């Protein structure tokens, strides 16, 4: 598991109150992990803080799974 994947899973676990062990990369924040719209906004803000990046609203709306969050972070994280 990559460092970014591990960090994303940790944030998802903290924000959504689920066990890291229950988070799979294909998990949907809403359908599988029980997030509501406020949870997803807070999740995006936590990802922005963790990875020191900005996620525009139109991009944030497209991040609906753990894998999409990992992919976005990998593509936009400052090295």
Swiss-Prot record:
GO biological process, one term: lipid A biosynthetic process
Location of the Carrier domain: 2-77
Pfam families reported in the protein's UniProt record: PP-binding
GO CC, alphabetical: cytosol; membrane
GO molecular function: acyl binding; acyl carrier activity
Cellular compartments annotated: Cytoplasm
Pathways per UniProt: Lipid metabolism; fatty acid biosynthesis
Top-level taxon of the source organism: Bacteria
Modified residues (O-(pantetheine 4'-phosphoryl)serine): 37
Alphabetic keyword roster: Cytoplasm, Fatty acid biosynthesis, Fatty acid metabolism, Lipid biosynthesis, Lipid metabolism, Phosphopantetheine, Phosphoprotein
Post-translational modification: 4'-phosphopantetheine is transferred from CoA to a specific serine of apo-ACP by AcpS. This modification is essential for activity because fatty acids are bound in thioester linkage to the sulfhydryl of the prosthetic group.
Cited PANTHER family: ACYL CARRIER PROTEIN, CARRIER DOMAIN-CONTAINING PROTEIN
Stated family: Belongs to the acyl carrier protein (ACP) family.
Alphabetical list of NCBIfam families matching this protein: acyl_carrier, PRK00982.1-2, PRK00982.1-3, PRK00982.1-4, PRK00982.1-5
Physiological role: Carrier of the growing fatty acid chain in fatty acid biosynthesis.
Designated name of the protein: Acyl carrier protein
Organism: Janthinobacterium sp. (strain Marseille)
């Amino acid at each position: 598991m990559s460092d970014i994947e591990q960090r994303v899973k940790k944030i998802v676990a903290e924000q959504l109150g689920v066990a890291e062990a229950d988070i799979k990369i294909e998990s949907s924040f809403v359908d599988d992990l029980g997030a509501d719209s406020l949870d997803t906004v807070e999740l995006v803000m936590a990802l922005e803080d963790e990875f020191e990046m900005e996620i525009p609203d139109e991009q944030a709306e497209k991040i609906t799974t753990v894998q999409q969050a990992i992919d976005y972070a990998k593509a936009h994280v400052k090295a």
